[in-house]
Amino acid sequence: MPCHEYLPWLYLLWQEYFAGEYADHSSEPPSAKTLSVFKDPAEVKRTVCSISWYPDGGKKLAVAFAIMQFQDWRMDGMSSLSYIWDVTNPNTPEMELQPSSALCCLEYNPKDPHLLVGGSYNGLISYWDTRKGCNPADTSIIEKSHRDPVYAIAWLQGKTAFECASTSTDGQVLWWDIRKLGEPSEKLILEDKNSPDNRPMGGVCLEYSAAAGPTKFLVGTEQGSVVSCNRKAKNPADRIGTVCEGH
């Protein structure tokens, strides 16, 4: 078929596929505007440490508040509450979450929107079932928890919807099953092979994606490195893989 005979078909395809779309040739730079402001209701204002969207439609958000500066004078009167907001009502939280210590991280369970897990300033892990009120359904014990604030926590995508992993500046990655928080199910020390005193690297962020492999994850450290880890490496020494040094 000659090329000119394709043109009407291409035009119809373009009309159908790009219906309702138009090119913006304006010279105005991209912009955004504030829709709502969700303020800490506590008298002593705190830092927003973590935000997690409600997994079923994004109609709510859970926000963790804490003061992270050690020995900050404001900590004496600091509230430990964190909150869940309905995005259509920024004036009043829909629900309070009452941990034993202020939350540094907080995440909705992607498979069950009633469940949240959080890591506290005092190193404890707690989880909530929002159908049962503001108090944690369970909390780990001091002796088996992190020794520093829990900076990051992530739900794992496995056979159950109850597993998560946490990290802290104490140099540990701990795996948990929220149905039995008496002790972590596994532990990994973020060993720094370049450290003369074998001091572990402090974890400050944690990224897990099932697409990268169900046992693989990344940890960002306070030393500026990104550590690639494999939970199920055949050799325990290989659980820490590539270490990408900071600039």
State where each predicted segment sits:
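Acidic and/or Ser/Thr-rich intrinsically disordered tails and linkers
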Residues: 1-84, 136-140, 162-165, 171, ...
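Asp-box/WD-like beta-propeller blade repeats and closely related beta-sheet repeat scaffolds
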Residues: 102-103, 135-158, 162-164, 191
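Conserved loop/turn at the beginning of each blade in beta-propeller domains
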Residues: 44, 99, 146-149, 197-199, ...
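Solvent-exposed strand-loop boundary residues in beta-sheet-rich modules
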Residues: 88-89, 131, 179, 232
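Conserved beta-strand position repeated once per blade in WD40 beta-propeller domains
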Residues: 50, 105, 152-155, 205
